[in-house]
């Protein structure tokens, strides 16, 4: 398959000067002060180091007082956690898990001892007697517990560890709620330094706001069960808290809250919803963060995502490449960019470029070789510039590997890997991967990203029509329905509602004949509902969404349930319990 190369940016934009950005922290003097506000200031400096790609220096700075300061301990554990999640390396996971355990023990020493009764009912009475360190220890403890829980999910894939992680998350949430009681009790803050209060408030609001936001994406059936045990998933309240923290200039959590908001609008709203970000909010938040971290890999990535979603794909490609070139310490940051570049080139039907990035991921990343191999297979199949005999030989070899590369987490198969395995298995019997590349782009919200670019969408419709005319005589009913489903999606984004509806009805009328692609009818029903929402026929839309949700046991079922929940939310409805 030849030597792996990374395609250069195809952008019309002139590349910035190669002069390396020199920030204020290239030459640092460590502070050994253990005063609370000094340790918070050190953590703020470390955050800037990390976000400006000074990863090793940031880790070294936090390790200096790791066993003496709760903020250093929390910061050090957070850095190790990020590294472990990126590398998926067993040694990194074990190191982060051990640091997380020790961090909780260190922070525990700073906490005020209290009974359960005092935790629930006596926040004000107890709080005003607490020292500044004891107050902030509650905050640090909640954060460290969350990291420990997440590491448990990643590190141990058994059911007992899953339960342990869930209990840690519940304790973490309860601790944040206790911090909220302290934050809202005026007597607690009488006579204290204003900065101590502001740092505490920003951390508490950010923790609760992030929790509320993430819980709000869960289907009502799950959320209502969680509410019984004390969780709350109010999206409006979560957004309000995060925007409040973002405005608290000078606090440790202000830039972090801005990053959470950007991540929500630019990534999570697509992964766990219908892709309806508030781009105006993103455009307001971006300048302040790019001023803080102008050449940081993470900020360049976020800027690229904003450009991608705004429709400037060439500029997005340019900034993804800039993110890659900005640092070489954490190679795993590159993999996130490769993933995005794979799709960015796919949107423009540069299949050889997409295949190249899939090949890079398959070679370098440990996250899911099953998915990467499948992507290489389908993009290679779509690339008509490759000689047919060589293409078929490569596709057959790749498709045969996909199912055997699946992994399990907590004893469970990963839904997207199961989907890829089934599609690859079907190829071995039908010799067809017709429109598999467009289908994957659909499931990963590609049409929501480029849907407003009518020229691009029309190009995809023309390409599908051309290929269909060549292949339709040898296609089965599943391929037939997939063609009309994807064409319907494209026509919906072109606002050709009557034609789109006809395509979805063609799929639904043949539901009983579909053998493998049983996920098409529920997704076609959902797409019909989205048509009705755009026509403001909300009652009919809700009926269709309920019907789509009633389907069971098909590939990527949870992904559709998240979309249904998000669509219900746009109409002010909650998904039913049953």
UniProtKB/Swiss-Prot annotation:
Pfam families the record matches: Iml2-TPR_39
Key words of the record: Repeat, TPR repeat
Residue runs in coiled coils: none
TPR repeat spans: 297-330, 481-514, 522-554
Stored InterPro entries: Iml2/TPR_39, TPR-like_helical_dom_sf, TPR_rpt
Record-linked Gene3D superfamilies: Tetratricopeptide repeat domain
SUPFAM superfamilies reported in the protein's UniProt record: HCP-like (SSF81901), TPR-like (SSF48452)
The organism's place on the tree of life at top rank: Eukaryota
PANTHER family found in the cross-reference section: TETRATRICOPEPTIDE REPEAT PROTEIN 39 FAMILY MEMBER, TETRATRICOPEPTIDE REPEAT PROTEIN 39B
Protein name listed in UniProt: Tetratricopeptide repeat protein ttc-39B
Gene name of this polypeptide: ttc-39B
